[in-house]
């Protein structure tokens, strides 16, 4: 069977943990519950899932393999509802979910063929007509926002490339198709998405050439990044489907090999563009990072980071780090001054516990900052400075520790969910108050006053 090198574009995100046959059955039950069996395509998919359940329970005895199976099933379970929603953004997200899950079972294509069969069925729910409508909706909105005539013109070609390619796959996947394997291979070599990269390349070029410095510019770049993610996810899933079709005995191995190479075109160049955007040692990217990070902040950020990981984009490990725990918070400008549990400002002398605060990561990736007392106070923004209080202030008490580097030193900028464009800084005097300013402090003449350090207080961990 043809080598699976085509999938080298995907990170091998191996699922951890042990899944029993009962757990697999439970996962499949969850998948079946999300399938609309009243629709013809849904009924066919439902029956195939039921059959796959029997095969999996008989075939896999190794714990690691069962865990991989669960990874693929989990991706299908989340994707089916998105495919059936009719929402173009959710459909694109469903494609990405499948790409993430399938990366865990790529080592042995033959052994996991039942799962690939179901994948083909799920992809098949995305019919040719819906493909044209959905892809058109996904890209049209963002392209219109860019007011870019060249991109708008290229859009029409992209819609046709995707729709015709899906129509071809839906046709040959049909069990009544009388095409021979060699005919399928010949046709597969000429489906439009096989060659179509112009629009995606244009989107990347726009991102590369735009240095976002204002909130509106940053939001446009984020929209372009999301557009790129949607387009590549859709295209890669179509190519995956096409590869499955022609990488089986009887088809042309040369065509299968060609499909692998097409997927890799431009990948390294694209990765370099994204890695430049995520640099933590470049002051030009700091404001952008405050809008993209944390990765859990919204569906847009989640999708972009998930795709970056699939593309193996390199970035600062701290963008994945969880800072939850007891931390000592200080300023690079006044390294001996700490944000104390008993005060609302950086102080030279803190009462016990010495400069220790509790950080808790919230569902949206932002952090709450609390004192470590039995009846803790919560840190929040009050106007342009910070206070500790027992009152709740919603988004004003959600903070973002944006990881940056000064030389080789790993430090943080402090912003909030409510105002990602405003950053904390300390005055040059030793008073220690924390103020917020609109923009990156170091670019506004504040030097090191807007850089902060965090250190785990091992003695205060609970």
UniProtKB/Swiss-Prot annotation:
Swiss-Prot/TrEMBL GO biological process terms: killing of cells of another organism; monoatomic ion transport
Name assigned to this protein: Toxin CqTX-A
A GO molecular-function annotation: toxin activity
Main location: secreted
Family: Belongs to the jellyfish toxin family. Type I subfamily.
Temperature and activity: Heat-stable protein that continues to cause erythematous skin eruption in the patient and to recognize IgE after heating.
Record function comment: Critical allergen and main toxic protein of C.quadrigatus venom. Has potent hemolytic activity. Is lethal to crayfish. Causes cutaneous inflammation in humans. May act as a pore-forming toxin, disrupting normal transmembrane ion concentration gradients in susceptible cells.
Post-translational modification: Contains disulfide bonds. N-glycosylated.
Keyword terms, alphabetized: Allergen, Cytolysis, Disulfide bond, Glycoprotein, Hemolysis, Ion transport, Membrane, Nematocyst, Secreted, Signal, Target cell membrane, Target membrane, Toxin, Transmembrane, Transport
Signal peptide: 1-19
Any Gene Ontology CC annotation: nematocyst
């Amino acid at each position: 069977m043809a080598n699976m090198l085509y999938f080298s574009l995907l990170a091998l995100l191996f699922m951890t943990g042990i899944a029993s046959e009962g757990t697999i059955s439970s996962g499949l039950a969850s998948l079946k519950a999300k399938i609309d069996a009243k629709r013809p395509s849904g009924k066919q998919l439902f029956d195939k899932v039921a059959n796959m359940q029997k095969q999996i329970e008989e075939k896999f005895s190794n714990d690691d393999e069962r865990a991989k199976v669960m990874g693929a099933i989990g991706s299908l379970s989340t994707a089916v509802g998105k495919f059936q929603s009719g929402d173009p953004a959710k459909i694109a997200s469903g494609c990405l979910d499948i790409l993430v899950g399938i990366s865990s079972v790529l080592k042995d294509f033959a052994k996991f063929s039942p799962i690939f069969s179901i994948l083909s069925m799920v992809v098949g729910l995305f019919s040719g007509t819906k493909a044209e409508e959905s892809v058109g909706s996904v890209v049209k909105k963002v392209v219109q926002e860019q007011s870019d005539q060249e991109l708008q013109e290229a859009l029409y070609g992209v819609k046709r490339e995707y729709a015709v390619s899906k129509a071809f796959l839906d046709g040959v996947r049909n069990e009544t198709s009388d095409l021979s394997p060699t005919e399928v291979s010949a046709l597969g070599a000429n489906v439009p998405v096989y060659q179509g990269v112009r629009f995606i390349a244009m989107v990347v070029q726009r991102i590369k050439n735009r240095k976002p410095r204002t909130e509106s510019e940053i939001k446009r770049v984020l929209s372009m990044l999301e557009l790129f993610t949607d387009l590549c996810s859709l295209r890669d899933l179509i190519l995956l489907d096409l590869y499955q079709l022609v990488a089986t005995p009887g088809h042309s191995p040369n065509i299968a090999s060609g499909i692998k190479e097409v997927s890799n075109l431009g990948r390294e160049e694209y990765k370099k563009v994204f890695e430049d955007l995520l640099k933590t040692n470049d002051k030009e990217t700091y404001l952008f990072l405050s809008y993209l990070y944390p990765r859990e902040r919204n569906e847009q950020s989640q999708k972009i980071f998930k795709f970056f990981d699939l593309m193996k984009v390199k970035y600062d490990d701290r963008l994945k780090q969880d800072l939850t725990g007891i931390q000592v918070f200080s300023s690079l400008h006044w390294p001996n001054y700490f944000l104390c549990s008993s005060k609302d400002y950086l102080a030279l002398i803190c009462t016990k516990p010495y400069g220790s605060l509790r950080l808790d990561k919230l569902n949206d990736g932002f952090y709450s900052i609390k004192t470590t007392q039995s009846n803790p106070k919560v840190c929040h923004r009050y106007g342009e400075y910070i206070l500790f209080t027992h009152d709740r202030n919603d988004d004003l008490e959600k903070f973002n520790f944006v990881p940056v580097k000064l030389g080789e030193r790993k430090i943080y900028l402090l912003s909030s969910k409510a105002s990602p464009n405003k950053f904390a800084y300390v005055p040059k005097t030793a008073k220690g108050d924390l103020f917020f300013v609109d923009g990156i402090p170091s670019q506004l003449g504040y030097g090191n006053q807007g850089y902060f350090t965090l250190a785990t207080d091992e003695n205060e961990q609970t």
